[in-house]
A protein has these predicted regions:
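Cytosolic-facing regulatory segments adjacent to core modules
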Residues: 38, 73-193
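Residues immediately C-terminal
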Residues: 206
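Substrate-engagement module of ASCE P-loop NTPases
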Residues: 72, 218-245
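The Walker A/P-loop phosphate-binding site
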Residues: 2-110
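Loop/turn-to-beta-strand initiation segments
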Residues: 146-149, 195-198, 234-240
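Flexible beta-alpha connector loops of hexameric P-loop NTPases
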Residues: 150, 209-220, 252-256
Length: 256
């Protein structure tokens, strides 16, 4: 009986997605690279992704392109769905995040390559008037994107991130059902079922451990209890953790 219920549930998912694709609806948010999309189907709701690489190889830049800029462009072409990104910037400030967006837009729109320092005319570099005019033309993009992307740069511990995400979802949905006696948890029901929620943490090696925890324990707890159990399985979020892959540094940090 249980086996039949499992199969029937799986079959329902398969048939629902097949019908949705045949009707031209979205089942995953595709990347702008055709070859990559053949190997990786894009972002799916209720999944946990980890973007990992060694120090200073562009993890944050790749994350912003694939999970912020590409998602923004994809959904612009699919107005039947909506999205919200809760981007927890543990390393950079909110200002630095949006400056990096302007830098990316300048390259995409005008093939102009500028660092954040150059955007702010630091050091020996002074921004020219023509580039400043082009920066001003990015305003509509940034204004529109910032209405969908919340950059949180003041929350550093796992529970704080969990609470922020949980509170946002309660403002945009409700919890129903549940039974203490039967040990059944409440189910989350979004107000808008066509809204895709993203939780991005960049990067989890910078999480602040709770009192008595090591960094290794804090990362494990965050991934297992908050990301997998709550964000993914309960809230159905697209959850992305950026992880620094520097084994020597990690071992030193984990054992402090």
């Amino acid at each position: 009986m249980i086996q039949e219920e499992i199969f029937n549930s799986l079959l329902e998912t398969i048939e629902t997605n097949k019908k949705a694709k045949e009707e031209g609806k979205v089942t995953s948010l595709l990347f702008p690279f055709e070859r990559l999309s053949q190997k990786f189907p894009g972002w799916e709701r209720g999944h946990y992704y980890c973007i990992t690489a060694a120090t200073s190889v562009g993890k944050t830049k790749l994350t912003k392109f694939l999970a912020v800029i590409s998602v923004y462009k994809f959904i612009k072409e699919h107005p039947e769905i909506d999205y919200k990104i809760l981007y927890f910037a543990l390393e950079e400030s909110r200002e630095e995040f949006w400056l990096s967006m302007i830098s990316s837009l300048l390259y995409e729109m005008y093939e102009i390559t500028l660092s954040l320092a150059q955007l702010k005319s630091l050091g020996n570099y002074t921004l020219d008037d023509d580039t400043l005019t082009k920066i001003k033309q990015c305003k509509q993009w940034v204004d529109d994107m910032s209405s969908k992307v919340d950059v949180i740069d003041h929350v550093y511990n796992g529970y704080g991130i969990y609470k922020h995400v949980h509170d946002w979802h309660l403002e945009n949905g409700s919890e129903v059902g549940g039974s203490v006696e039967e040990k059944i948890g409440k189910k989350y029901v979004p107000t808008n079922p066509n809204l895709w929620a993203f939780v991005i943490v960049d990067h989890i090696s910078l999480l602040t451990p709770e009192k008595g925890e090591s960094l290794y324990e804090a990362i494990g707890k965050f991934s297992k209890h908050y990301c997998l159990k709550h964000f993914v399985k309960k809230l159905n979020c697209v959850t992305i953790a950026v992880q620094q892959q520097d084994m020597t540094t990690d071992k030193q940090e984990y054992h402090q």
